[in-house]
Amino acid sequence: MRPNNRAVNEPRPIKITRHYTKHAEGSVLVEFGDTKVICTATVEDSVPRFLKGQGQGWVTAEYGMLPRSTHSRMLREAAKGKQGGRTMEIQRLIARSLRAMVDLTALGERSITLDCDVIQADGGTRTASITGACVALTDAINALVENGTLKTSPLKGLVAAVSVGIVNGEAVCDLEYVEDSAAETDMNVVMMEDGRMIEVQGTAEGEPFSHEELLTLLNLAKQGCNMIFDAQRRALAADC
């Protein structure tokens, strides 16, 4: 029996609140059950040095967790003086995922930075961050089109992400912390709205998984992402 009696292919309740802060060009509070992440999009009329003069833009991301977003307080990375390997891995994943949804040439020579700050963690913080940041990025780019900065939208479609895994011998979708900590296999899948995959990260924490189990997990991820896309579309269609 899963927590909250969820079906094996059922994500946690997803809530996406747009325009959550007033200063950023795009801002979202995304909630996957008890995991909550604030995602903001900042537009700047400049690009990294390696892209100057090349006529294309850039999308990047930063990720962090508040000290008491977890069960016990952890030190701020700023207090340690450096980012941890996990943080750098996650923010690179977020950035790669979001760049896949944007035509960088059509964006022009400007940068958009997505800041993903976890305020409460209960598993799946990276997948929630990608899902929420996608909506914040969409709002920021739509604003550029509406104010005439961009003539056409560089958006290629939505991006969503979900965790899947094998827990107690059963393949399940969208693991919360108690499931994630007990999983024999843990996988994160990032998908485009058209069904193409951007990234698959899978690890056997216990027993190795079979090819058949891999296909089962990917199928679960597709079902989960389709439900997440529905939540994103509903949020973007809502009047705020």
From Swiss-Prot:
Keywords: Nucleotidyltransferase, RNA-binding, rRNA processing, Transferase, tRNA processing, tRNA-binding. It catalyses: tRNA(n+1) + phosphate = tRNA(n) + a ribonucleoside 5'-diphosphate. Gene3D superfamilies: GHMP Kinase, N-terminal domain (3.30.230.70). Its EC number is 2.7.7.56. It comes from the Bacteria. GO terms for molecular function: 3'-5'-RNA exonuclease activity; tRNA binding; tRNA nucleotidyltransferase activity. Phosphate binds at residues 86, 124-126. SUPFAM superfamilies: Ribonuclease PH domain 2-like, Ribosomal protein S5 domain 2-like. Disulfide bonds: none annotated. One of its GO terms (biological process) is rRNA processing. HAMAP family: RNase_PH. Phosphorolytic 3'-5' exoribonuclease that plays an important role in tRNA 3'-end maturation. Removes nucleotide residues following the 3'-CCA terminus of tRNAs; can also add nucleotides to the ends of RNA molecules by using nucleoside diphosphates as substrates, but this may not be physiologically important. Probably plays a role in initiation of 16S rRNA degradation (leading to ribosome degradation) during starvation. Belongs to the RNase PH family. Homohexameric ring arranged as a trimer of dimers. This is Ribonuclease PH. The gene is rph.
